Curated annotation (Swiss-Prot):
The keyword NAD applies. InterPro entries: L-lactate/malate_DH, Lactate/malate_DH_C, Lactate/malate_DH_N, Lactate_DH/Glyco_Ohase_4_C, NAD(P)-bd_dom_sf. Its EC number is 1.1.1.299. GO terms for molecular function: L-lactate dehydrogenase activity; L-malate dehydrogenase (NAD+) activity; L-malate dehydrogenase (NADP+) activity. Pfam families: Ldh_1_C (PF02866), Ldh_1_N (PF00056). Substrate binds at residues 85, 91, 123, 154. It catalyses: (S)-malate + NADP(+) = oxaloacetate + NADPH + H(+); (S)-malate + NAD(+) = oxaloacetate + NADH + H(+). The active site is at 178 (proton acceptor). SUPFAM superfamilies: LDH C-terminal domain-like, NAD(P)-binding Rossmann-fold domains. This is Malate dehydrogenase. One of its GO terms (biological process) is tricarboxylic acid cycle. Belongs to the LDH/MDH superfamily. Keywords: NAD, NADP, Oxidoreductase, Tricarboxylic acid cycle.
Amino acid sequence: MVKITIMGASGTIGKTVAFNLAEKDVIDEIIMFSRPASHERVKGEILDMYDALAAEDIDCELKASSDYADLAGSSIVLITSGVPRKEGMSRLDLAVPNSKIVQEYSKQIAIHAPDSVILIVTNPVDVMTSIALKTSGFDKKRVIGLGNHLDSLRLKTLLSKHFHINSREIHTRVIGEHGDHMVPLLSSTTIGGILLKSFVEYMDLDVPKLVETLKNSGNNIISKKGATEYGPSYAISNLILTIANDTRKILTVSTYLEGEVEGVYDVSLGVPVILCKHGIKRIVPLKMNDEERTEFFDAARTVKKTTYELEKMLNKE
């Protein structure tokens, strides 16, 4: 039996992920966890979802809960709760208020679902991944951040439009911070197995503009509709289904590093990993050119500094 708990299920991301997963008809039970004040609203969301699922003859158990005891038996616990990002805010602006939420939930997960995989979506996700890891006491392979998986999908879309190629043919990756210090690995990006730079259209590619557009993708959506929704939700569902089905895909997620990539340690960053039913099977080696390596080190310094400062602040309270 596969049981998923979504903490923050009353929010846009949480409820959309719940419906995405239910539609796939591979999850047996989904606990939609929220604060008591949102409990009735979540019940309403579930009733609405059941009507939609009935049209497809899908039978998935959905339950609204505000009781931590309902986490018991969860294979994966998703944390989406937090202060939402608004236009003009960096993800790091959210660190202080959101860290307290992640701390509280991580403690409860450790008590009620000690064998689960924790998946962090709350921003700044790289910092929150470290907070969840240290608070829960879990093995680092079982604490994962959404991180650059979403950024990699966004880059894939941008390249698909520029090169007029089906996105399935594009293999690219973004690593580092899920934020201003993300690192697109264009030097190793391929289309149909051929290096990006080999295509004549590459001559017309304004790389600095591409990277800037990529970094501003989330903010651009927020400025127009108030929040990101479908992209993050489907990226999250992709990660959850990969873990739940043990399909061993290589995806880029935020994980705590201890020297595995370029000697970077004591910080959570986005790197490619093989995902399995137990979380991260292993980190996958990757190639970077000198410029990308420098940017990766910059990302490590930035995220590590923020994490240290935040931990110091939390320890004083």
